[in-house]
């Protein structure tokens, strides 16, 4: 009898997946440079510097004793509150754990077959290609314009009979720019594929594209509680989908994927409009401060981060210099086709923003 080797148990597609590269953690930087952890400023993962809503924290404390009980299988309680927040009926909403990534996993699970294609404009959030590849799909990359805008004609030109999903990000990560409504309409109206718009950062922006889900049955929008709501550690996301897709998604969705703690914290966070508005205003004011004061070219942003071009310096060297000073930022060389001179900087508190500006000023002469 012949036995498979352990690697032979794994699907071939898995070996084609490049490992996802997250931002550096406080623990990593503290260990690498001998810095006291409380003094480190983490501006590399686009987290909310104000933390979660006090109401969400209170909900976690009150819910924890009941953590031995399963939550509702479909997160109905959260979806009802999201219905009021988004203006969409519950029948258009799905909740997902872990975060929006879980939504992407679920959609690829029900849509992508071996040999299917997904379109990914680059540079953008790296995760889109991972679940597609894991399901046997092939990512087709379309380069963005030099200003990181999309060319709808290029996107549509990449569509083939095997195209199943087109992934778009607005505001885009790592560039922070919005997708114009006219461009989205053109893409959606001229493809058979599902168009997925990632709006993880949309609360920080001047407008959103979610309303178009009412008009098109091949358009879906994903959102998260990790950014403006400050619940990144709970891994909670949701999708606004056409009703036909909600039905099929629910067939294969992981039961109880949203934990009881995440569910209750999400409901509480949605009720705290004061914390929501403070978080939005902090990001909007801070990104303008960073754009005006960082001594390198800074792209306009509609998110809670800015993209810095440190040319002629290299992003890795400048980022390492900042990290030695206890400031974590994100060099963008791990983003496909982003080059080696871009750094993404999360908007922090005013004090943190001042420190990062000073660190960039010093790095400009040190690197």
Swiss-Prot record:
Belongs to the class-II pyridoxal-phosphate-dependent aminotransferase family. Histidinol-phosphate aminotransferase subfamily. GO terms for molecular function: histidinol-phosphate transaminase activity; pyridoxal phosphate binding. Pfam families: Aminotran_1_2. It catalyses: L-histidinol phosphate + 2-oxoglutarate = 3-(imidazol-4-yl)-2-oxopropyl phosphate + L-glutamate. InterPro entries: Aminotransferase_I/II_large, HisP_aminotrans, PyrdxlP-dep_Trfase, PyrdxlP-dep_Trfase_major, PyrdxlP-dep_Trfase_small. It comes from Methanosarcina acetivorans (strain ATCC 35395 / DSM 2834 / JCM 12185 / C2A). Signal peptide: none annotated. Keywords: Amino-acid biosynthesis, Aminotransferase, Histidine biosynthesis, Pyridoxal phosphate, Transferase. The gene is hisC. GO terms for biological process: L-histidine biosynthetic process. The modification N6-(pyridoxal phosphate)lysine is found at residue 227. Pathway: Amino-acid biosynthesis; L-histidine biosynthesis; L-histidine from 5-phospho-alpha-D-ribose 1-diphosphate: step 7/9. SUPFAM superfamilies: PLP-dependent transferases (SSF53383). It comes from the Archaea. This is Histidinol-phosphate aminotransferase. Its EC number is 2.6.1.9. Its cofactor is pyridoxal 5'-phosphate.
């Amino acid at each position: 009898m012949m036995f498979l080797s352990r690697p032979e148990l794994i699907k071939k597609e898995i070996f084609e997946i490049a490992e996802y590269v997250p931002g550096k953690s406080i623990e990593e930087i503290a260990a690498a440079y001998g810095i006291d952890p409380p003094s480190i400023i983490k501006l590399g993962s686009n987290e909310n510097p104000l933390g979660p809503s006090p109401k969400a924290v209170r909900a976690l404390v009150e819910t924890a004793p009941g953590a031995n009980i399963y939550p509702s299988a479909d997160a109905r309680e959260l979806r009802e509150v999201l219905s009021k927040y988004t203006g969409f009926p519950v029948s258009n909403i799905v909740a997902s754990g872990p975060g929006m990534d879980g939504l992407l996993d679920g959609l690829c699970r029900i849509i992508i077959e071996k040999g299917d294609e997904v379109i990914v404009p680059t540079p953008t959030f790296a995760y889109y290609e991972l679940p597609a590849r894991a399901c046997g799909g092939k990512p087709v990359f379309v380069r963005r314009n030099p200003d990181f805008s999309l060319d709808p004609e290029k996107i549509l030109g990449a569509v083939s009979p095997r195209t199943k999903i087109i992934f778009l990000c607005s505001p885009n990560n790592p560039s922070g720019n919005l997708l114009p409504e006219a461009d989205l309409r053109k893409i959606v109206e001229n493809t058979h594929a599902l168009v997925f718009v990632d709006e993880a950062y949309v609360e920080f922006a001047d407008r959103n594209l979610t309303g178009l889900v009412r008009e098109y049955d091949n358009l879906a929008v994903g959102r998260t509680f990790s950014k403006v709501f400050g619940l990144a550690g709970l891994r909670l996301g949701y999708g606004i989908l056409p009703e036909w897709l909600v039905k099929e998604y629910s067939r294969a969705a992981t039961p109880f994927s949203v934990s009881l703690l995440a569910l209750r914290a999400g409901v509480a966070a949605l009720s705290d409009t004061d914390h929501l508005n403070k978080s939005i205003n902090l990001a909007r004011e801070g990104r303008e401060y960073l754009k005006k004061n960082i001594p390198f070219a800074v792209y306009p942003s509609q998110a809670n981060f800015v993209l810095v071009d440190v040319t002629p310096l290299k992003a890795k060297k400048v980022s390492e210099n900042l990290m030695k000073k206890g400031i974590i930022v994100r060099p963008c060389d791990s983003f496909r086709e982003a080059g080696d001179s871009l750094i993404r900087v999360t908007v922090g508190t005013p004090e943190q923003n001042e420190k990062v500006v000073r660190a960039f000023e010093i790095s400009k002469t040190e690197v």
